[in-house]
Regions:
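Short loop/turn motifs enriched for small/polar and acidic residues
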Residues: 67-69
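Short basic helix-loop element that most often maps to the first helix and adjoining turn
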Residues: 9-27, 53
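DNA major-groove recognition helix of helix-turn-helix/homeodomain DNA-binding modules
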Residues: 49-64
Length: 72
């Protein structure tokens, strides 16, 4: 469950760092505010395509890393 929590935390932190409400992010991305809420509450799993749209709406890029277990 940790990777899912990390994605949720990163999404919320990024949105807040850009001083955006869920509604404002929804308007910028065309993604319904209810869907953003579900993502942030962990009741919906995002696709990479959806995460990319969210990142672009926050004027950010999406970066995904594979990290060896011993470095965690």
């Amino acid at each position: 469950m940790q990777p899912e929590f990390d994605v949720i935390r990163a999404l919320v932190d990024a949105r807040i760092s850009q001083n955006l409400t869920q509604k404002e992010l929804a308007e910028k991305t065309g993604i319904h505010q209810a869907d953003i809420s579900k993502l942030e509450n962990g009741t919906r799993n995002p696709s990479i395509k959806l995460l990319k749209r969210l990142a672009e709406g926050m004027d950010m890029i999406l970066k995904i890393e594979f990290i060896p277990k011993q470095k965690i």
